[in-house]
Amino acid sequence: VVGDQVAVVGDVSGRKDTLARMVRIEPRRTLLLRSAEDGDSAGSQKPVVANADLLVVVTALADPPPRPRMIDRYLVAAYDAGMEPLLVLTKSDLADPTELLSLYQPLGVRCLATTITESGISGIEVVRQALAGKVSVLVGHSGVGKSTLINALVPAANRVTGHVNEVTGRGRHTSTNLQAVVNPDGGWVIDTPGVRSFGVAHVAADDVLRGFADLAQVAQECPRGCSHEPGVIDCALDQWADKADEASTRETRCGRVDSFRRLLTASLDAQDPTKA
């Protein structure tokens, strides 16, 4: 797994005709996992990166539009892995970041915004400082600007950048494999291929709520043993969503509850032996 620290014996000089072998994988501090949520392999886990400190969730504010439910998945995965999440909003010259910031800053998630300018990327220095000395993993769906950020942070990386399809609104996969590069400011920066989904069905149902700090607080008002599933009587999550005074607030809250319940259902289904 990328990020693993291993013990090696033999000739590690790298010279021709030398031989060395790995004898041990050291204990992992963190482990980012991704799981399948559909078909026969639902719930199966795949390790992505080991021993990383930061999960840098890169999200475009426009072109392509942001996907809050994808961000929610990454937050659940980050907390499950033992990593700190960092939300980096790109293309803030195309759309106002206020709405997304109002969703995630109150949850204690650090959020940074960047803008492409004629002289470079505005805001990149703050991102650089946040990543300095740490092992950071950049994730996000295609077209959000991960490779552009990598190239700004580590020019020697020379990652290929792409554009968003105007018809589908989706980015083209320019990164097809994980690449770890040394951060000039200390640590490592790991670029991951753009994805259109990130399964978290491997996360235990009780732990899914950790990715929704706002809902976790509300859930304390639920009756003992409440599963928080759709249709459960007296679930405080429904009451919280319904009692919002303004329609826009009600819509936002309903969206948060629905996002949580989708991930909760996937987790419960994956852990149900009768559905294997």
For the regions a language model picked out, list residue spans one by one:
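Canonical P-loop GTPase G-domain recognition
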Residues: 84, 91-144
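Signal for well-folded cores of large energy- and translation-related assemblies
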Residues: 60, 75-79, 93, 100-105, ...
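Phosphate-binding glycine-rich loops and their immediate beta-loop-alpha structural context
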Residues: 44-54, 58-112
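Helix-rich effector regions associated with P-loop NTPase G domains
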Residues: 2, 10-13, 18, 24-48, ...
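Well-ordered alpha-helical segments embedded in enzymatic catalytic cores
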Residues: 70-73, 126, 259
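A conserved segment at the C-terminal end of the G1
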Residues: 146-162
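Conserved active-site beta-strand-loop modules that form the wall/rim of enzyme catalytic pockets
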Residues: 116, 135-143, 147-151, 179-180, ...
